[in-house]
Curated annotation (Swiss-Prot):
The keyword Transcription applies. Sigma factors are initiation factors that promote the attachment of RNA polymerase to specific initiation sites and are then released. This sigma factor is essential for normal fruiting body formation. Pfam families: Sigma70_r1_2 (PF00140), Sigma70_r2 (PF04542), Sigma70_r3 (PF04539), Sigma70_r4 (PF04545). The keyword DNA-binding applies. A motif (Polymerase core binding) lies at residues 73-86. One of its GO terms (biological process) is DNA-templated transcription initiation. Keywords: DNA-binding, Sigma factor, Transcription, Transcription regulation. Residues 250-269 bind DNA. NCBIfam families: PRK06596.1, sigma70-ECF. One of its GO terms (molecular function) is sigma factor activity. Belongs to the sigma-70 factor family. It comes from Myxococcus xanthus. InterPro entries: RNA_pol_sigma-70_dom, RNA_pol_sigma70, RNA_pol_sigma70_r1_2, RNA_pol_sigma70_r2, RNA_pol_sigma70_r3, RNA_pol_sigma70_r4, RNA_pol_sigma_r2, RNA_pol_sigma_r3/r4-like. This is RNA polymerase sigma-C factor.
Length: 295
């Protein structure tokens, strides 16, 4: 089970994108059948699961184009993440492969980026690493809104969004930069079509919609399963203080159970901590990387 993606020029990337666009997408029943066959030792079924999702992998890899790595390296790591997901995917869970695989894909891409950025460029603290990834994502959002690159001119706005100092944004911006072969680049000298056009289609848009929906469904499922690990009182507190449309005040919560507002606050903190621990545990059991859930 492997996905070939050797390219180092616009033409070779174009050829690769054209090739993967030829692989048919799978319905959920087809996906489940192939997954069961692969788990039974059918490597050809695993290969079909991989190739059917390569277009989606490219679109995820493209989101990380601002980190100065070659698109070929990003796509290669993303493909490895996809293959890992195929190996661990359980078709009996009732979710689509793409919604499960996206966390593996992002995790492998991010790990590749972290390995290739020196500590001098990136910084050594966890906060600096979080800023590293958040900053690029915010830059892409600003570009989509027509605000231009997230450079020093936008430092204050970005700092407010990320809840960091503007000086930290400026420093990280200076560390970042450089792009490789872009999927936005024209395919030919006289053509307006771009490389990304090869992976932009109604079918891929449908895949994206399914992925978003399945990711939301998976998140809701994990939260509900985590809630079931709480006792009835803890569950009530979370439902009324976190998940309810009309949020109970701490005073109302204390009155409901017959204890003080301060005691209600303490129990709320305990319930939230227990829910978080249960959710992290369930994510690990499902093979979902916690750090990629908010990616």
């Amino acid at each position: 089970m492997q996905a070939s993606n050797s390219f180092s020029s616009p033409d070779s990337l174009s050829t690769y994108l054209s090739e993967i666009n030829q692989y048919p997408l799978l319905t959920q029943p087809q996906e489940q059948e192939l997954s069961k066959r692969f788990r039974a030792g059918d490597l050809a079924a695993g290969h079909q699961l991989v190739t059917a999702n390569l277009r989606f992998v490219v679109k995820v890899a493209y989101e990380y184009r601002s980190y100065g790595l070659k698109m070929s390296d990003l796509i290669q790591e993303a493909n490895i993440g996809l293959m890992k997901a195929v190996q661990k995917f359980d078709p009996d869970k009732g979710i689509r492969l793409i919604s499960y695989a996206v966390w593996w894909i992002r995790a492998y891409i991010q790990n590749c980026i972290l390995k290739n950025w020196s500590l001098v460029k990136l910084g050594t603290t966890q906060a600096q690493r979080r800023l590293f990834f958040s900053l690029a994502r915010t830059r892409r959002e600003l570009e989509k809104m027509g605000a231009g690159d997230a450079n020093v001119v936008n430092a204050e706005e970005i700092a407010r969004k990320l809840n960091v100092k503007a000086s930290e944004v400026r420093e990280m911006e200076q560390r970042m930069g450089g792009r490789d072969l872009s999927l936005d680049a024209p395919m030919g000298e006289d053509g307006d079509a771009t490389h990304l056009d090869f992976v932009e289609s109604e079918s891929v848009s449908a895949v994206d919609e399914v992925a978003d929906r399945q990711q939301a469904n998976l998140t809701r499922e994990l939260v509900q399963r985590a809630l079931r690990r709480l006792d009835p009182r803890e569950r009530f507190i979370i439902e009324q203080r976190v998940m309810g449309d009309a949020e109970m005040t701490l005073s109302e919560l204390g009155e409901h159970f017959g204890f003080s507002r301060e005691r209600a606050r303490q129990l709320e903190i305990r319930a939230k901590d227990k829910l978080k621990l249960a959710l992290v545990t369930l994510m690990a059991e499902a093979g979902v990387d916690e750090s990629t859930l908010n990616a």
